Amino acid sequence: MSGESDQPQPGPSHAGLYLEHRERDQAGVPGGVIRRAGSQRHRSWIQTVIEQITGSPRQCVTLSEVVPVSVLAVQRYLLEDEPRDTVPKPPLYCYDVTISDGVYQEKCYLDPSLNFLVYQNILKVGIEMRISRVSCLYNEKRLGQGILCIDKVHCGEPLDVISVETPFRNRAHEEKPERPLRGSKSHYLALWNNEDPYGDIWKTNKQPEEFNFNNTKIISLSHLEMTWHNRKNFPALLVRILHKSKLRYYGKPNKKMIEPYQTYLEVADSSGMVSVIMWNALCPEWYKSLRVGLILLLQDYSVKKSYPLRIQPDPVDPQMKLISTMEICLNLRDPPTNIVIIPEKQLKSEWKLPKLINRFITRSELDDMPENSICDVIGMLSFVGRVQRSKKKENSEDFWSYRWIHITDGTSEQPFIVQLFSTSQPEVFENIYPMTYFVCTQLKVVRNNSQVPKLLYLTTTNESRVLITGHRGQPYTYDTKAKKIIQWIKTKTNLEAKNTVIGGYYPYPPVPETFSKYSRFIKAESLLTTISEVRKVIEDLQYREQKRIAIQGIITAIKYIPYNHSAKSAPASETLQNASPPSTSQAAAKEGHYHERGSKRSQDDRPMDSLPMVLSLCAKRKILQGPTANPVPVPQPHSSAQMKGNKPNIPSRENSTANATGKSKRIINDRWESQLWRDKKFSLRDHLHYGHVDPESIPRKFILGHEKFLTQQFNSQPAKYVPPEGKPPKLDEFQSARSLGHFEVTILGLNHEIAIDVAFLPMYSPEDVETSQIDTFLTCMNYSCVYPPAAPVSGRVPDPKAVAGDIVKAAADLDRVHIIGILDICNLGNNKVEVCLQKIYTPE
């Protein structure tokens, strides 16, 4: 940096990287927009822009000087109480973007027409960005709150490091609690869902306190049930929390609620269990301080008739009475509820409060559990999948966040497979990784024994709670089953940590063995998608949203693509592996994304045919009947340590298909294309290319010591930038849990006008000779789970290329056969999409 420069110079090293100490100018108007940087060594670009636009509100200004800035925060909120007629069909949510020019930080309002940049995770924290058109907007409900609006922007690449020490130009942006730029009473939401508490409005400071009961009248729940209709004032309740639900956000535009939240507590005394509803601003005040097992004294509450459509969780104790005719309501006002946490040491035997009881089951017991049963599990995490999202309703802006995990408890070769939805515990949900003690309560059993492979997994409910730390002293540590499992976990070694996996594409739940069974669970109008509609499906997906569709076509070509890297016998931080060549979309991404207010997404910015692809897996024939293979990754087939002195003795069969007869086909080594494809491929109306496998799609072997980096890679993009600790490794430096490469499969539409390339990655373990016994392409795609067992298998180890040759031949046998392909599609963000062939059906 030159000390003679009046303005920060453009370039990748500029954005937010000024490290000199700068004193704030104290001459600004309190809460005002303009604060002049009189004594700054470097002139603030943000200051210059603000001075240029404040006199012309709502007028777009094209900037004569565009310099790179860094993005420090992207925050979402509902615009609750401002006119929404300025934009036709305005979006439900708005975004504030905090930028830094190296001198000042500024919180800016993103024009709603650019919201899709956040939906697609193109505009995200940590990147370099150039803003070329802006406007000024005043919040008339706040003094001096002029807002810098972003109307045209170019999103660049992530920066290695950004200084977070620069001050805000506008002191109002530093106020606590942090409030959005627009709306008088709005608050920030979690970036990717509405269930997680986010921001500094959520308190954690409520502690148990000694209470003098001398002048306090207490009523039992059963007595209250009989008399509440005739009462105006209610005596205090002394209860224990047995269940706590996740948060429900019910905010809507033009509803003037300060914090529109709701949560349920199931509480009990000696006479029964009842639902308690905590409303609105009381949730940020108390939610994070309340936990299952606490004793509460509730005063100044209200009582109402229970909501008829809500299903209460059953008491764990079958002798406990379930009170379902009334609900206890807690509010910050009308009346203002008084809540006291009573310390456990003050508990008196005459209160007869129920103890906290768990319903732990072992993995060996799960096979006999009926569908929809509720249970608790404890064990060790052996697989932690990436965070994904699904729409709550079609055409909705609201999403569920979830991830797939495997839990082992030593009672079975198979793990618990759990679909873990967000439980309003982001501090847990975002910090789980393999080899962690894991407790999850109130899980529901999902099963279908008539399906092949059998469907059996657990899913969270509204009352599920997760614990990964603070186990000591918890009531469940005295449970007989839990104690045995805890002892088993203590015997696990670091060596076994090598058999754990994190992240990547996870093809679960499996689809049924026939298309007729598959179609029973799909709405008729959305059962089949034309290949020409696939592009639109992909464009409509938001960040980490996954969708499963079915297409019809003909397999006309297949190509085997082995991994082009080798796993070295070194720590992940020292293991450098060559990544696959970037797709066209990745190359385009490096040039950045340019977008302006009111413009539609340009063709160059769509996640189109050049986007990368995801892996699809199959399983070994010997486990087709069950969904629960032990989640153990396999070593890299090309590892120098493995290959040296251990070359396979089985002759390669990759050329065994070269003399195939029958239909017209050409098979050369590791690829095949049909005569139909040679005739049609140059006259297609459209060809969608999704054959690339992105590094994020590949499950990685978990390595202790790198848990923070790996966890961050497979979590959702954060709302605020956190500087890295030292120089972080790269994801493709971590060894893949796959040993066989992937296949690029070309499917031609039935009308021979459009084709699509998709990725298919079969299950393969070089330790297991049975994986080479692939009879047909169809058999290979009848998988059960992601990872093969760890049990050693005697016999010769087949060459991966020999297995690939079998799969190529199996695909060739389907020449000109009309098939139905089940595709899993996921938006990975930043114009990267994975499309995976999960299953193929032939006409029944």
Curated annotation (Swiss-Prot):
Keywords for this protein: Chromosome, DNA-binding
Chief subcellular location: nucleus
Compositionally skewed regions (Polar residues) per UniProt: 572-587, 652-662
Location of region: Disordered: 571-609, 626-664
InterPro entries in the cross-refs: NA-bd_OB-fold, RADX
Pfam families linked: RADX
Residue ranges of DNA binding: 228-331
Subcellular localization(s) per the UniProt record: Chromosome
GO molecular function, a single term: single-stranded DNA binding
Basic and acidic residues composition bias: residue spans: 590-608
GO biological process: negative regulation of double-strand break repair via homologous recombination; regulation of DNA repair
Tree of life domain: Eukaryota
Gene Ontology terms: cellular component: replication fork
Task of the protein: Single-stranded DNA-binding protein recruited to replication forks to maintain genome stability. Prevents fork collapse by antagonizing the accumulation of RAD51 at forks to ensure the proper balance of fork remodeling and protection without interfering with the capacity of cells to complete homologous recombination of double-strand breaks.
Family annotation (PANTHER family): RPA-RELATED PROTEIN RADX
Annotated protein name in UniProt: RPA-related protein RADX
Protein species of origin: Rattus norvegicus (Rat)
